[in-house]
C-alpha cells in the first residue's frame, strides 16, 4: 500500500466528523490535499460547510473543488480543523510546518473548538525532533535572530544545526506572510515545552512548528498487507 493510499485512508476516516453547517479549518500539505478532494465530493453531494484555508495553496485547492470559503475575519471561531502533521507523539504534541504554512495553521487551529490530525502512521513518534522543526522569522535582523534561536535551542538541551529553508528553485523560501523559515535539525527534542518557551522569547521569531496542547486527536493509517488499518490517538 502506497503512502498516498494511507493518506487517503486517514482522510476518509476524518470525513464523517464534518457535519452540515460546520465552520471548518482546512489544513495544508499532502494529507490535507487528500482530505480536500474527499470534502469536495461531499460538498458537491449537498454538504453545506464553510472552510477557512491555512495557505494560498489550500485556498486554490478548495476553490477548485467548489468548497465555500471564508476568513477568520468573517468566522473568528471555528468548529473543527482537519490538518496533517510532520510528527505526532503519544501526548498529541506535534511538529508542523513542512509545507511552510505553520503560522496560519496554528492561528486556524487555535481558533477551532477541536483540531484533528490526519497522517500515515510513520508520523507517530516516541520523541519529537527527527523531522526538522520549522521556525518562522522576520527578515529584518535575520542574522541576529538566527544566533538567538541557536542559543535558545542550546538552553533547552538540544543540539543540532540551523538551516534557512530554500524553495525548489534554490532561492530563500518566503512564506505566505513574507517571512523566512529556519529549519532546526535537532534529531530529538527532549523537552518540547522548554524549547517552545525559549523560542518565543526571541525577538524576530514569528511562530514555530511545535503545536503543544492544540490537537485533540490524531487519525493514523498504517499498511497491513494490502489494506490500511486506521487507529486513533485521543478522542474524536
UniProtKB/Swiss-Prot annotation:
Pfam families documented for this protein: Rib_5-P_isom_A
Domain of life of the source: Bacteria
Alphabetically ordered keywords of this record: Isomerase
Catalytic activity, EC: 5.3.1.6
Entry-linked InterPro entries: NagB/RpiA_transferase-like (IPR037171), Ribose-5P_isomerase (IPR050262), Ribose5P_isomerase_typA_subgr (IPR020672), Ribose5P_isomerase_type_A (IPR004788)
Active site, UniProt feature: 105 (proton acceptor)
SMART domains per the UniProt record, alphabetical: DeoRC
Gene Ontology process terms (BP): pentose-phosphate shunt, non-oxidative branch
SUPFAM superfamilies in the cross-refs: D-ribose-5-phosphate isomerase (RpiA), lid domain, NagB/RpiA/CoA transferase-like
MF annotations from Gene Ontology: ribose-5-phosphate isomerase activity
Binding site for substrate: 28-31, 83-86, 96-99, 123
Reactions listed under catalytic activity: aldehydo-D-ribose 5-phosphate = D-ribulose 5-phosphate
Annotated metabolic or biological route of this protein: Carbohydrate degradation; pentose phosphate pathway; D-ribose 5-phosphate from D-ribulose 5-phosphate (non-oxidative stage): step 1/1
UniProt similarity note: Belongs to the ribose 5-phosphate isomerase family.
Function: Catalyzes the reversible conversion of ribose-5-phosphate to ribulose 5-phosphate.
NCBIfam families according to UniProt: PRK00702.1, rpiA
Complex and partners: Homodimer.
Protein name: Ribose-5-phosphate isomerase A
UniProt source species: Methylorubrum extorquens (strain PA1) (Methylobacterium extorquens)
Upper lineage: Bacteria, Pseudomonadati, Pseudomonadota, Alphaproteobacteria, Hyphomicrobiales
